[in-house]
């Protein structure tokens, strides 16, 4: 576990990071060009979103060739160079693989459509019901039915996601063999990590049936045989190598995640789960607006941290990624008077937890949601689908746009803001997605020139994790659970105790400090606090972490 307990992983959405060709799309050489910046931040691994050949119906998660590079991003030589140059800087490369489905443009699916029985069995082809309707009533994660009818046929194929993303049948050993070959191909290329997309939906039941209680997910989420599949994947590919693996787990539960990530189970290094990012979803609905339920947020964090600590599971720690709106205006305040303290509060909240922190590109400089005003500014397939769905459900276009400004995945996919030049220094061409309007004020160049910027606070967080074993693997205990607006916890090991306090409020707040920490060292504060007392008055959005050495 130590190989990833001290690391911080930085997520790059290649399409939006840095463009070296002027075509408006970020590329692999653009990541290589910015390695020195990432080394200065202190991260030790870069997770890249998909860069494979793809029709780009779901921004690369519709993969048409697992072992090639889309010319949009460069060539295989560029990936080889990136891996080599990153390694020189003690940075590993983690790639994103989608093992649940392929693009309908993938040769496997094309051969299946052409009637090849070998590849036909790679996918879920099923006959329509007697009345011609889809085989089941399952709902796609992107809206609509999860089955698509083949033209001129009574057959359908299953797609839990976009209609161009056909689900693979993991019960077929030939499918598993082909996917293991893909993973080993990239290990041989020097890749040191894998982020495995929607991994816990790969195991479907033998018989697919209607769901009269929901949308079908209860049949395939953490489905039958999932742990056996992951053990086989581990054994056949990355198991005996120093490879870090993280599984993205959709609508999962703690018990399964402990099994996925406990090293004794020999499945994965860690898991992504999203329960904490649904605390502003009324009745679990993403496309309705509501305030964050802070008590629920605290409860989720504490429950997962305690269970994972006690049962030796391992969490990926994150607020932001390419599928989520940015956290800054969502979980804290993006108002100018609170901007710095909110951004640093969010960073400290998860970086002192037990797990491996992930920093999403731009988070370290305080990038925010762009809140584009019209649907013409958005390109995300899920957003465009729901623009139509929500209006059909009776909302006005203006009401729908207010939801999209807060919920769209494009919020986190706007180009990285490097400087105050045209297009924020991202490209000399026309960017594939608009640059946020605040790029003149919020950018890397400005952050690096100010030693009290959000960037340097994140740099300190990353360095502290490398330095202190108690942050890496110490036990986790909730603290001050009854205090509203306060999220706090203790970390401890044989030699050290750590108390991390985070005030999610816009007003001052008084708390009592436990006696054991009255002589503690201030490890980190976003208000430059130097002294502490038994009664502390916390400032708005203050984060304070104390460290106390235990007496021998």
Which residues does each predicted region cover?
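Beta-strand-rich binding/interaction modules
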Residues: 508-526
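Hydrophobic residues within beta-strands of alpha/beta enzymes
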Residues: 46, 194-196
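C-terminal beta-strand-rich structural cap/linker in extracellular carbohydrate-active enzymes
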Residues: 533-552
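Acidic/aromatic-lined carbohydrate-recognition and catalytic surfaces
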Residues: 2-184, 188, 201-253, 263, ...
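Short catalytic/ligand-binding loop motif for oxyanion handling, primarily in non-cytosolic enzymes
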Residues: 21, 54-58, 101-108, 202-205, ...
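Loop/helix patches that line or flank the sugar-binding groove of alpha-linked glycan CAZymes
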Residues: 4-5, 228-244, 251, 259-273, ...
């Amino acid at each position: 576990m130590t190989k990833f307990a001290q690391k911080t992983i930085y997520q790059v959405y290649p399409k939006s990071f840095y463009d070296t060709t002027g075509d408006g799309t970020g590329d692999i050489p653009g990541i290589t060009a910015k390695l020195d910046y990432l080394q200065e931040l202190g991260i030790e691994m870069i997770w890249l979103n998909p860069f494979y050949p793809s029709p780009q119906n779901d921004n690369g998660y519709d993969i048409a060739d697992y072992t090639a590079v889309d010319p949009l991003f460069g060539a295989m030589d560029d990936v080889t160079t990136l891996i080599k140059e990153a390694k020189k800087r003690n940075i590993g490369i983690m790639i994103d693989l989608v093992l649940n489905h392929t693009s309908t443009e993938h040769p496997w699916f094309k051969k299946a459509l052409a009637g090849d029985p070998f590849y036909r069995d790679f996918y879920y082809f099923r006959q329509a019901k007697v009345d011609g309707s889809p085989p089941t009533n399952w709902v796609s994660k992107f809206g609509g039915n999860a089955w698509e009818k083949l033209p001129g046929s009574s057959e359908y194929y299953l797609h839990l996601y976009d209609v161009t993303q056909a689900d693979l049948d993991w019960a077929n050993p030939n499918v598993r063999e082909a996917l293991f070959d893909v993973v080993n191909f990239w290990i041989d290329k020097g890749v040191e990590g894998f982020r495995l997309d929607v991994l816990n939906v790969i195991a479907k039941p033998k018989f697919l049936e209607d769901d009269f209680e929901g949308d079908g997910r209860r049949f395939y989420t953490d489905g039958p045989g999932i742990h056996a599949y992951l053990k086989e994947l581990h054994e056949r590919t990355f198991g005996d190598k120093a490879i870090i693996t993280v599984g993205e787990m959709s609508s999962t539960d703690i018990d399964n995640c402990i099994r996925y990530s406990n090293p004794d189970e020999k499945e994965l290094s860690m898991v992504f789960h999203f329960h904490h990012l649904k605390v502003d979803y009324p009745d679990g609905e993403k496309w309705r607006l509501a305030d964050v339920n802070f008590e629920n947020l605290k409860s989720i964090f504490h429950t997962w941290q305690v269970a994972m600590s006690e049962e030796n599971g391992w969490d990926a720690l994150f607020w932001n990624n390419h599928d989520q709106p940015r956290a800054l205006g969502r979980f804290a305040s993006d108002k100018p008077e609170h901007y710095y303290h909110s951004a640093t509060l969010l960073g400290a909240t998860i970086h002192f937890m037990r797990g491996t922190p992930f920093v999403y590109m731009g988070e370290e400089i305080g990038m925010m949601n762009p809140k584009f005003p019209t649907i013409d500014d958005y390109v995300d397939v899920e957003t465009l689908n729901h623009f139509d769905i929500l209006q059909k459900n009776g909302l006005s276009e203006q009401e729908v746009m207010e939801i999209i400004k807060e919920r769209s995945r494009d919020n986190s996919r706007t180009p990285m803001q490097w400087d105050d030049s045209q297009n924020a220094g991202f490209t000399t061409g026309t960017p594939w997605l608009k640059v946020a309007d605040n790029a003149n004020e919020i950018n890397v160049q400005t952050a690096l020139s100010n030693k009290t910027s959000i960037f340097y606070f994140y740099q300190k967080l990353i360095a502290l994790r490398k330095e202190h074993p108690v942050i890496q693997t110490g036990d986790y205990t909730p603290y001050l659970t009854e205090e509203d607006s306060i999220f706090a916890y203790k970390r401890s090991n044989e030699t050290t105790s750590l108390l991390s306090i985070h005030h999610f409020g816009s007003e001052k707040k008084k708390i009592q400090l436990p006696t054991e920490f009255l002589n503690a060292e201030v490890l980190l504060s976003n208000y430059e606090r130097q002294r502490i007392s038994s009664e502390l008055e916390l400032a708005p959005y203050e984060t304070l972490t104390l460290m106390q050495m235990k007496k021998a």
